Every structure is written in C-alpha cells, then in structure tokens.
C-alpha cells in the first residue's frame, strides 16, 4: 500500500515570520488550527480564537473547518499565495511571543481580552457570564417550495425540539440532537443546522434580530450541558475543543465558533464508498429479479436506452406500489415523454420517491447513467419505507437490525455500526449461519481466506442455495476499487425482508416474482368516429338503465301502498266491531284521569297536490241514558295520495282508513246546537227527557284505554311515516333529476374533452408529420447538395487533370524543341571546329613540305645557316605545340565530361532508379572505355612525336619513310579528332537525359556517327602530296642536332603529361565511386527520354513522398517541469538530431546534478497522452503540429516534486 501523500503548510504572520506543518489530504482546517493552537499557546494562560485565511492576488478567503488546505496547496501551486491566522476581529495573529504578551496585556486593560484557556468555575460563572435557561418561539423551517412554521424549544439538554403548536406536552415532531452539530448563520439570515449524522435543517425568521438570537441560543445550548457538582451548581461550562472553529457570519462582533472538534467530525470526514458502475449493476439485477415473471429483462450495457420509453418504470410501479398507469406503446418522442411524465408524477405524488429535479427529456434522451440510478434508487427507498420514509430511515433500520443479530451471534467479534461495516463479507456470513444453520458455513475457514472476493463468493452462493436470497450483487464488488455501500444495503434488504418476519407481504411478493404474470398492457388507440359511437352507445345504455330502474321503483311503491291500504281497512273493521260490542253493555260512569296528550312535531309543509284537511263536527245529545255519546262525522274530499308519483293519472284516489271515533270526557251538560244545513255530515236530533239526577259516568277499563291510546299512536305514526316517505320520495326524485342532469353535463363535458383531446392529438400528429416531412425534405436537399458537390469536385478534378496533361505536353514539346535546337547548334559548332582544325592541319602540312623542300634545296651548301636552322626548329616546335594543344583539348573534353556527369547526377536525384546494379556496371564499363580511349589518344600522340623525330634523325631512310610517317600522323590525328567528337556528342547527350533501357539503338547510333566521322577525317587527310626531297649527310646531321633539342623538350613534356594523366585518372575514379547510383551513359533520343521521365515521375508521386530537406537548422522549444519559474528552453538543432543529444543539451543548460540525471527524460505529449522518447530516436520525426516536448522526472507526482532549482521566494 502506498504511503499517504504529504505537503508542507507554511502559515505567515504580519511580520514575515512563519510556522510550518506537514499535512495530508485528509487534514481539515479545524485540525490544523487545533494543532497550531497547542504549539502557539501551550504555555500561555489564555487561548486566542483564530481562523485560517488564504491571501491570493489581493483577495482574502476564509477556510471553513471542514475544508482541506491540501487541495488549496495543489490549486494555487503556481500562484502567489500565503496563509495567515486572523482572529475574529480581523487582526493578524503574531508568532512573536513578546508581541503576544503586550497585546494580551493591552487587551486585558481595555476589556477586550480573549477568553481564558481554563473554563471558569461554577461560582464565578454566575458573576461573569449569564447561563441561558432555554428559549422557545416560532421558527420557519425551509422545505422544497415552502416554509413550515414550527414551535421550537431549546433547553440545556443539547436538544432542539420542534412542535406543531405551542402545546409542548405532546410528542415533538422532531427532536434534534445538538451533539457534534454545526451551526452556521448565513449572510441571507438563514440558520443552517448540520447534525452529527449529516442531516441538514435550515431555519429562518421574519425578524433579523430573532434569528441571530436563536443562533446564539443554540450555540449556548451546545456548549453548556447539565452536570453534577459538589457545590450544588447545576451547570458546568464545556469548552469548545476547536480554538476558532469558524466565525458566525452576520452575527456581529465576530463572536462564536460554531464548529466542533475534528475528533467529533470523524463521521463526517469518513470517506464514503461509492461506485456508480457497481450501483448500476446491482440496481439492474434488482429490477430484473422483480420483473422476471413478466418476461422483462434489462441488460447492463443498455441502461441508457432501456428506460427511455417508460415501460420498465410502469411495470415496476405496478409491482412495487400497486399503481396502474395507462400508457401508449410507441417509439416517438411524444409518446415516450408522455409515459415518463406519468411515471415521474406518480412516483413523486403517490409513492413518496424523492428523485430530485429530473425531467422526462433527461430520461428519454439519457446520456448519463446517474439519472437512471437516481430514479431506481428513489424507488427502492420508497418501496422499503412504504412511501413514507427517507433514505436515512431505511439505512438506520437495516443497520440496527443487522447490528443486533451480528452482535448476538459473533460475540462482539464483528461490529456493524454503519454501512461501511458491510465492506466485511463476514457480516453476511453471520446472517447465513443464523437463519440457515450454524453449520452452513465454516466461519473459521472463511476467516482464514485472505481474499474478500473469495469469501463473498462462498457466502453469496450459500445464501442463494439455503435462504433463496437473490444474487443481485457479485463477489467482485468487495474489491477495493468497486466498493459501494448502497449496493450492500440493497443486498442486506433482502435478508431483512426474507428473514426478519416484519415484512411478510414484501417477502411473499419478492419470492413470487419469478412466477409468470402478464405485464401492463398499453391503451388501445381508436379513431375519433369510433370514440363518438362508443360515447353514444354508453349514453343510450345509461338512459335505458335509468328508465328501467324508475319503472321498477314505481311498481314497488304501488304494491306497497296497496298492502298498506288493505291492512288499514282490516284494522278499521276490527275497531268498529269492538266499539259495537262495547256499546251494548254501557259501562258505569267512573272518573278516569285523562292521559296527557303525546306531543308530536308539527306536520311539515306538504306540497300543493295534498288536499285540504277533513272537516269534523261533534254533537252531544242528552238521552235518558246517563251517558254522553259523541258522534264524529268526517267528510273526506277526494285527495291524491302523497306517496304517488307526480306522473300518476289525475283523478285516482286511494282511500285511507277512517280514524277511530274519539270519546271525550263530558265537562258540562251539553246544550243542543243546530247543525248547519250546508253540512254534508249526518247529525243526531236531540230528544227531550224528563229531568233526573246526574248519572254516574261509565267506568272505562284500563285495557280499553290502552287499546285506544295504541290505536291513536299507531295512526299518528302511520301518518308521520306516510308524510316522511312522501318527502323522501320527493327528495329522492329531485336528487335523481339532479343526478341525471349532472351525468348529462358530465357526459357532454367528457365528450367535449374527448373531442378536444382528439383534436389536439390530431394537431400534434399533423405537426409531427409536418416535421417529418420537413426533415425528409431537408435530408433530400442535403443529399442533392452533396451529389452536386461531388459532381462539381469530379468536374474540377477532371479539368485539373486535363490542364495538367496539357501543361505537361506543352513542357515536353518545348523541351524537345529546345533539345533539337541545342543539338543542331552543337553539330554546327563541331562541324566548324572540325573544318578549322583541318584547315590548320593542312597549313601545317604545307609548312612541313615547304620546310623539307627548303632543306633539300639547301643541301648543296656545306652548312645550314642559322636562319634556316631556326626555321626548322620553329617547325618542329610548332608540331610539338600542336600535339600539346591536342592533349589540352582532350583534357578539356574530359573536364566537360566530368561536368556533364555532375549535372546528370543532380537531375537524376529526383528519379527512382529501377535497376541500379545493371546501370552501375554499364557506367563502370563506359568510364573504363573513356579512360582507355583518352589514354590511347595520348599514347598515340606521343608515339607520333617520337616517330616523326626518329624519322628526321635517321640519316639513311629519311627520304624513303618520311611520307609514310606523315600519313600515319594524319591518320592518328584524325582518329583523335573523331574520338573527341564522339566523346563530346556522348557528353552533350548526358547533359539533360537520363538512362534508358533501350541501349541497342543508342549504341548503333553512336557507332554510325563514329564511322561517318572517321570516313570524313580520312577523306580530308588522304590528299595527294608531293614526293619528299632527299637529304645529304650534312643536312641530316644538322637536323639531328635540332631534333636532339626537341627530343629533350618532348621528354619533359611527356613527363608532365603523364602526371596530368595520372591526376585525371584519380579524378575519374573518385567520380566513378560517387556515381554508383546513377544511370549508365548512353546517347538516347532526348524527346523520348523526357516523356518517359515525366511518366515515371507521375507514377512515383503517389507512392513516394518528395525527399525532405535535411539541410539547415530549426529552433525547438522544450517545456520544463520542476524547474521553478523557468518554464521552457529553446535550442537550434538539425533535422537528424537525436533525442539523446537534446536531452544532454537540456541537462547541461539547466545544470542538473549528475546524481539526478538518470531520473529525467524527454517526453512527447499528444492529446493529453505522453510517452518517453528514446535516445536513439530522431527528435523532429516524432514531432507533429499538435505535439509538444516536455523535460521532467519519470513517474513522480507533480505535487510531490520539490525542486532544488526553484528560487526561494523573498516573501
């Protein structure tokens, strides 16, 4: 395991002094402040509160206690920055102890001294500092899109309780522990409370002073806690372990550090194990397990596209939350987004899933797997918590259950206190042994396995075989680079649901997921006409059903009334018979107290269809019998029964049973009263009887009285019942009418909505079709445009080829004309030169003959006069000079030949040589032939000179062989001239033409030319000459003397010429060695060769790029890393300079020590990737336009590179 990275943190004061500390990436600002406080104020009696600030570019920035200064050191590595300590008043903390003492003394006198290091005693606390007894009041809690008004209570027990109202006797809605919490007052006057378990609550208040007061109160509540003291004090001050801990922003006066110590923030600073790839795999396996029975399976490689149409979400919602969503099956964007919108709405409103701010377009056009992961994770949390909880509730529930079982079974060997504890696969091994049997897994053998992956593999297989726990996770998830706590929680949830016994319904469902079942079917799309017909049919069926129900109800009511009327008639007849029997036996008059009349509610107002009340006439007739008879006559007008429906035919009457006659107790002697004539009722006429004493009343038995009262009560109840039924019927009828009206309106509204929806759908489909049509047109136009562009490009290419061909033809023609013209001019010049030489040669011959004639003519004289000897010596000198001139001309032709070879090499360097070996051999043969020709010409000239001189020096045969010698000289001179001519013609052909494989025609051409030249030379020299005169001995001796001098000069000239020939041969050998790659020399037709060369160049162009220019130097910039302010250096190098040479140049220039040379190397960076250049690699061949060269150390992190070459900052 690699050691942790470390850096040195320098903190300065205002005087330039600084303190250093070695920090790690996990070191927080609070921890650093705490350690510096121990260093600075360990021996002092008072502690100064301070915070860590960074000054960069004139800007001051305060670091929170949860920030990591290590990140700032990396961020500002190449910038000018400094760290300082500042107190809450914004003053710099000085590292000079004298200044600290002076400052503390001045602060103590002025009353602004910092708090003491030791907490005050309880007795002193009452005098110096006020202890808060708690605070209560209303606070506004910020929620998504709203504020909840809660009654808040803070006491000295480190808890903040939130109630729905001011009644604090009930249980609070929230009970927040302030232990290890973070309290921050933001600039926008929002109080942010972060608990020890990372839960965050945001509060505010309408009053600014009130929210500041709450912040101070919560801080006091967090810092003061009740305790036991022998002195009777109730509270002790707990000093905040952080010396500064951050400042309360907006609180005024810079008071209060509201951050706990770094030890208390261990949970917050703990690195969470998160891996998106692992979580995606786990969630996909979870989804596949749930939807296995429906035949739906999602591949991990298709996460971005499998959920785009929403069908998988719809089936999951139906299985997990029993919420059926109607959807449309299709692949258009409108249908997919419509389905996803429905799913997201149901998840948020009915399932309690908090997936954040995700739109349907984010899912349908998904480009990041985290969007799908967030939705699936929210569905898992909502399903586990029954649509009511949050993620932390689910986490606490699982961890507490697992911790309890593991603690019991493992005897405290394994402790589960957070999701990070699930990184140990032995936790699941304990659960398997607990519920499947203690012998299922060999716990000791598993612990001996070092690989967590191997342990997890055995545990997962055992859980699947013995407990049927789905294998939603893989054993590779326990590797260090694939750990994910959420995946382990999902796997643990199956153990909890299957084995805890608290989630039986979920357990049955998850175990039955593999059973086949139908998936959610999409809604059928029908046409507008079919929808209208369907609505009309439904409307007609509803009307028929209502009509039938109405008829059945009327029929039932009618039968009920008939039964009631028959029962009433039977009751009336029984009452009448009873009354007759009672009248035959008149009872004795007795005094019976009247029963109190039973009160009843006043009759409700009847509808106008009810007839008027009956008319009753009561008469009392005195008779001889001492009884009072009361006759009641009732006249009933025709009425309509209140229970009948309004649609009953008019005129039909239903007879109600007459009420029983009411017998009243006589109060006084009744007087005779005449009955009105208009009355239709029957009356009794009074009869006169003799006066007699007052008769005693007939006593009534209690049974009769009771029966009477029962009858009256029964009649009253029947009447009330009839009235009530009538009112209920009318009310029901009215309600039915209203319901019919409402249904009709709803049907009309639904019909209108359906038509509107159909119209919108048609418009959307029309728009979609228009968009598709436009897109199709655009695609067609683009295709046509591309075809037209291709045609134009093809035409341009063809025209370019035609122009190029015409240009090449024109150049070839011009080249051919130029070559013909040059050849004609050269032939003309050579012909003139040859004629001039022949004329000169003839003149020399004439002079020779003349000299010989003069010698012969002067033979008669005894001696040769000095003028004659001088003249003869001049002739001999002239002959020698001519030979020298011939040699110089041969040398000139050889030089010209060398120059033409150089030009040929320069021209042929751009051509690709087909057969270098054969050409080299031909070239060598031609060079050897040329050398041998030149040497033979030179030797012939020298031999000619020797022969002519020998002839002249020979006394015996001068006259006889002089003619033969002159003829031989002429022949060899002409041969030399012809050889020089052939050499010149062959050289001129090399000036602009390369070699050609057609050598037979060229050789015949040269041989023909040579033969023609030889014949011409022989014709010119074969002229008739005069016979030479004979010489005497005296003349021969004089000539011998002259020729002796000439022979000495000739020997000297011969030695000089031999040296020149040796030098020329050496030069030719050097040229031959340098021309091994050139073509053989041959006289070829210039026009044909020029055309062949152009064709070869065209063929070789696409296969071989033109040679690079390897001459000159270029400037290369090398970037430097680890050399402080020196960022780059430049060098002028050649095209063939090696990377090792450049590396040595950089090492020498930057003065790298010999001990560190092997650590540096030269890198090439391309597109963010880099590689090390080898020392034997050419630098400029590895370069591209987008590359750059970097010189740095190998395999060393840049953040750890502390270079010795970095200049020490004066600051």
Curated annotation (Swiss-Prot):
Residues 566-596, 607-646, 655-668, 676-691, 744-753, 914-936, 976-1010, 1049-1083 have a biased composition (Low complexity). The keyword Nucleus does not apply. SMART domains: PH. Residues 277-384, 392-502 form the Calponin-homology (CH) domain. Residues 528-565, 703-729, 754-778, 786-853, 1093-1104 have a biased composition (Basic and acidic residues). InterPro entries: CH_dom, CH_dom_sf, PH-like_dom_sf, PH_domain, RA_dom, Ubiquitin-like_domsf. Residues 5-90, 1112-1196 form the Ras-associating domain. GO terms for biological process: chemotaxis to cAMP; negative regulation of actin filament polymerization; regulation of establishment of cell polarity; regulation of myosin II filament assembly; regulation of phosphatidylinositol 3-kinase/protein kinase B signal transduction; signal transduction. This is PH domain-containing protein DDB_G0287875.
């Amino acid at each position: 395991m690699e050691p942790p990275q470390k850096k040195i943190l320098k903190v300065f004061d205002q005087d330039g002094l600084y303190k250093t500390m070695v920090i790690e990436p996990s070191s927080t600002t609070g921890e650093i402040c705490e350690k510096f406080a121990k260093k600075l104020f360990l021996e002092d009696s008072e502690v100064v509160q301070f915070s860590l600030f960074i000054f960069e570019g004139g800007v001051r920035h305060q670091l929170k206690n949860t920030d990591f200064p290590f990140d700032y050191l990396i961020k500002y590595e190449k910038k000018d920055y400094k760290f300082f300590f500042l107190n809450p008043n914004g003053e710099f903390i000085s590292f000079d102890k004298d200044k600290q003492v002076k400052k503390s003394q001045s602060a103590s006198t002025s009353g602004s001294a910092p708090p003491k290091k030791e907490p005050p005693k309880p007795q002193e606390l009452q005098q110096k500092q006020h202890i808060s007894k708690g605070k209560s009041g209303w606070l506004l809690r910020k929620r998504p899109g709203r504020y909840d008004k809660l009654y808040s209570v803070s006491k000295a027990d480190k808890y903040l309780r939130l109630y729905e109202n001011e009644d604090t006797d009930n249980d609070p809605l929230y009970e927040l522990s302030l232990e290890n919490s973070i309290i921050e007052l933001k600039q926008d006057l929002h109080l942010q409370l972060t608990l020890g378990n990372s839960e965050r609550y945001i509060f505010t208040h309408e009053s600014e002073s009130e929210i500041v007061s709450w912040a101070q109160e919560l801080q006091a509540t967090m810092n003061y806690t009740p305790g036991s003291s022998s002195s009777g004090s109730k509270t002790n001050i707990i000093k905040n372990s952080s010396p500064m801990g951050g400042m309360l922003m907006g609180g005024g006066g810079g008071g209060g550090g509201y951050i706990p110590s770094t030890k208390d923030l261990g949970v917050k600073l703990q690195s969470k194990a998160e891996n998106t790839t692992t979580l995606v795999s786990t969630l996909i396996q979870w989804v596949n397990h749930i939807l296995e029975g429906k035949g739906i399976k999602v591949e991990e490689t298709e996460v971005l596209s499998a959920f785009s149409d929403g069908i998988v979400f719809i089936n999951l919602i139906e299985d997990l939350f029993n919420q059926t969503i109607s959807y449309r099956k299709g692949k258009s964007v409108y249908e997919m987004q419509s389905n996803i919108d429905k799913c997201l709405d149901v998840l948020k409103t009915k399932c309690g899933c908090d997936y954040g701010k995700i739109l349907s377009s984010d899912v349908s056009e998904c480009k990041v797997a985290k969007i799908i992961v967030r939705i699936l994770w929210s569905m898992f949390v909502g399903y586990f918590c029954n649509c009511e909880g949050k993620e932390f509730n689910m986490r606490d529930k699982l961890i507490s259950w697992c911790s309890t079982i593991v603690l019991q079974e493992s005897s405290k060997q394994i402790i589960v206190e957070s999701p990070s504890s699930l990184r140990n696969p032995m936790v699941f091994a304990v659960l398997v042994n607990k519920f499947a049997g203690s012998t299922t897994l060999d716990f000791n053998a598993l612990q001996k396995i070092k690989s967590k992956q191997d342990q997890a593999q055995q545990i997962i297989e055992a859980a699947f075989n013995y407990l049927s726990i789905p294998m939603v996770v893989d054993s590779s998830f326990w590797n260090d680079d694939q750990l994910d706590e959420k995946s382990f929680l999902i796997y643990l949830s199956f153990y909890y649901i299957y084995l805890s016994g608290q989630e039986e319904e979920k357990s049955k469902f998850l175990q039955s997921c593999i059973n086949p079942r139908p998936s959610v079917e999409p809604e059928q799309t029908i046409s507008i006409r079919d929808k209208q017909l369907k609505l009309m049919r439904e409307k007609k069926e509803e009307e028929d059903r209502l009509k039938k129900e109405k008829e059945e109800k009327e029929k039932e009511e009618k039968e009920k009334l008939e039964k009631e009327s028959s029962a009433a008639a039977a009751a009336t007849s029984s009452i009448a018979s009873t009354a007759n029997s009672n009248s035959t036996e008149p009872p004795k008059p007795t005094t019976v107290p009247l029963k109190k009349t039973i009160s009843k509610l006043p009759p409700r107002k009847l509808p106008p269809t009810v007839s008027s009340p009956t008319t009753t006439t009561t008469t009392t007739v005195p008779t001889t019998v001492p009884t009072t008879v009361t006759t009641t006559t009732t006249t009933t007008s025709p009425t309509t029964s209140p229970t009948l429906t309004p649609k009953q035919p008019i005129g039909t009457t239903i007879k109600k049973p007459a009420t029983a006659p009411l017998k009243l107790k006589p109060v006084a002697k009744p007087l005779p009263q005449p009955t009105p004539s208009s009355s239709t009722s029957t009356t009794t006429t009074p009869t006169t009887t003799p006066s007699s004493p007052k008769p005693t009343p007939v006593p009534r038995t209690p049974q009769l009285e009771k029966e009477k009262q029962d009858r009256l009560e029964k009649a009253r109840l029947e009447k009330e019942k009839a009235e009530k039924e009538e009112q209920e019927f009318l009310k029901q009828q009215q309600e039915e009418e209203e319901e019919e009206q409402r249904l009709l309106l709803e049907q009309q509204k639904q019909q209108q909505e359906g038509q509107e929806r159909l119209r919108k759908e048609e418009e959307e489909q029309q728009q979609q079709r228009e968009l598709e049509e436009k897109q199709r047109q655009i695609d067609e136009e683009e295709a046509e445009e591309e075809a037209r562009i291709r045609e134009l490009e093809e035409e341009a290419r063809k025209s370019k080829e035609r122009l190029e061909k015409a240009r090449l033809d024109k150049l070839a023609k011009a080249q051919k004309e130029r070559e013909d013209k040059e050849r004609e001019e050269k032939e003309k010049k050579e012909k003139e030169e040859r004629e001039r030489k022949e004329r000169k040669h003839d003149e020399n011959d004439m002079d020779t003959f003349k000299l010989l004639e003069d010698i012969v003519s002067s033979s008669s004289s005894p001696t040769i006069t000095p003028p004659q000897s001088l003249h003869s010596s001049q002739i001999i000198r002239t002959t020698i000079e001519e030979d020298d001139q011939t040699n110089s001309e041969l040398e000139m032709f050889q030089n010209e030949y060398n120059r033409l070879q150089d030009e040929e090499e320069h021209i042929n360097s751009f051509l690709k040589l087909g057969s270098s070996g054969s050409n080299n051999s031909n070239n060598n043969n031609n060079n050897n032939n040329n050398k041998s020709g030149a040497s033979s010409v030179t030797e012939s000239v020298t031999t000619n000179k020797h022969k002519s001189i020998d002839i002249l020096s020979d006394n015996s045969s001068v006259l006889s062989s002089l003619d033969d010698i002159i003829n031989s000289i002429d022949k060899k001179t002409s041969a030399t001239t012809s050889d020089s001519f052939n050499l010149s013609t062959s050289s001129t052909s090399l000036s602009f033409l390369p070699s050609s494989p057609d050598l037979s025609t060229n050789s015949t051409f040269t041989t023909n030319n040579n033969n023609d030249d030889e014949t011409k030379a022989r014709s010119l020299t074969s002229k008739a000459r005069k016979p030479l005169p004979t010489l005497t001995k005296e003349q021969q001796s004089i000539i011998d003397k002259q020729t002796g001098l000439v022979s000495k000069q000739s020997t000297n000239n011969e030695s000089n010429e031999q040296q020149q020939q040796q030098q020329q041969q050496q030069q030719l050998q050097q040229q031959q060695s340098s021309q091994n790659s050139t073509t053989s020399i041959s006289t070829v037709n210039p026009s044909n060769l020029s055309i062949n060369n152009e064709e070869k160049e065209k063929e070789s162009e696409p296969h071989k790029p033109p040679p690079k220019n390897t001459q000159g130097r270029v400037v290369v910039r090398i970037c430097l890393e680890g050399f402080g302010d020196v960022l780059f250096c430049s060098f002028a190098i050649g095209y063939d300079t090696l990377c090792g040479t450049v590396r040595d140049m950089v090492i020498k220039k930057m003065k790298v020590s010999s001990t560190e040379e092997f650590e540096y190397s030269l890198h090439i960076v391309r597109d963010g990737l880099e590689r090390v250049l080898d020392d034997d690699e050419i630098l400029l061949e590895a370069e591209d336009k987008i590359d750059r060269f970097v010189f740095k150390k190998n395999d060393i992190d840049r953040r750890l590179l502390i270079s010795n070459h970095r200049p020490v900052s004066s600051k």
